[in-house]
């Protein structure tokens, strides 16, 4: 890929709106994506998603998406494969990729979509290099500077701004249609990865927990309440410095993520 000309590569700007900031616990409520190339071709993907959980008010204040707006929308399971087909042959372009890609990566893993750890190009990093005159590099600030009408903090609008920032960066960089992707990466720097990592052994070894083996745990929630739960571990994951166990929880009758450090006992 590094020797391919920029003109021949498909890019895809992606943005998500979610119920919170932690992909281990929070859910996606909207996906917006724009697939494009330097020749000017464009195609978009957009959907609201029913997260099957309440959207907190403090998050609604950011993106404006309410429970009522998503109650008749498809679930993530209904759209994830079509979304994967849309982005799979593209280089992803994201504003702060580690956030959005971690949500997407975990959803792909849960649905059994075989993909390498997701990575993308970071328009925050690029904006800091090429728009250093701005007071900050938020999408709203960049949109205003570039004369883009973006009044709503919504996924597709933000993906479009992300695409426009990327195209402006290419223009300002001095690269042309004969430049290679490798030359662009020399400007961008190292690609940005999802923060989601699979852990198949470390938690199991330390805590004597095995995938597919039902266990009983004592779990302390954020309020300090301790509950006894029967769980069936499905996967171990790591997000940042925190490790989680993805498991079927018999108490809730659904899949849950348990923070490993909050498990205070195993029977």
Question: Where do the language-model regions lie?
Answer:
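Acidic two-metal-ion nuclease catalytic site recognized across multiple nuclease folds
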Residues: 1-3, 165-216, 221-224
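Conserved non-catalytic scaffold segment of RNase H-like nuclease domains
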Residues: 1-111, 116-118, 132, 139-152
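Residues immediately flanking
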Residues: 16, 96, 123, 233, ...
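Acidic, Mg2+-coordinating catalytic module of metal-dependent nucleases/exonucleases
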Residues: 91-108, 134, 138-195
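A short, structured active-site edge motif that brings together acidic residues
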Residues: 117-127
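Core beta-strand-centered patch of the WYL/Sm-like small regulatory domain
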Residues: 196-267
């Amino acid at each position: 890929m590094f020797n391919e000309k920029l003109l021949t590569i498909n890019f895809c700007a992606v943005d998500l709106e979610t119920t919170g900031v932690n992909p281990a616990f929070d859910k996606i409520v909207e996906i917006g994506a724009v697939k494009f190339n330097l020749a000017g071709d464009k195609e978009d993907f957009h959907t609201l998603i029913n997260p099957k959980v309440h959207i907190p008010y403090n998050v609604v204040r950011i993106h404006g998406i309410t429970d009522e707006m998503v109650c008749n929308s498809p679930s993530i399971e209904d759209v994830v494969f079509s979304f994967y087909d849309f982005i799979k042959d593209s280089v992803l372009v994201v504003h702060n990729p580690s956030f959005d890609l971690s949500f997407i990566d975990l959803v792909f893993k849960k649905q059994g979509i075989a993909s390498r750890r997701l990575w993308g190009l970071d328009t925050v990093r690029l904006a800091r290099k090429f728009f250093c005159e701005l007071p900050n590099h938020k999408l709203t600030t960049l949109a205003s500077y570039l004369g883009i009408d973006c009044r709503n903090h919504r996924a597709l609008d933000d993906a479009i701004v992300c695409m426009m920032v990327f195209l402006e960066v290419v223009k300002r960089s001095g690269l042309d249609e004969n430049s290679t992707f490798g030359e662009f990466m020399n400007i961008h720097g190292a690609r940005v990865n999802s923060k989601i990592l699979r852990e198949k052994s470390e938690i199991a070894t330390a805590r004597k927990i095995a995938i597919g083996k039902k266990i009983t745990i004592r779990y302390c929630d954020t309020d300090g309440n301790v509950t006894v739960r029967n769980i069936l571990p499905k996967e171990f994951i790591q997000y940042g410095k925190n490790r989680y166990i993805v498991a079927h929880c018999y108490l809730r009758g659904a899949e849950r993520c348990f923070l490993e450090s909050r498990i205070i006992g195993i029977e």
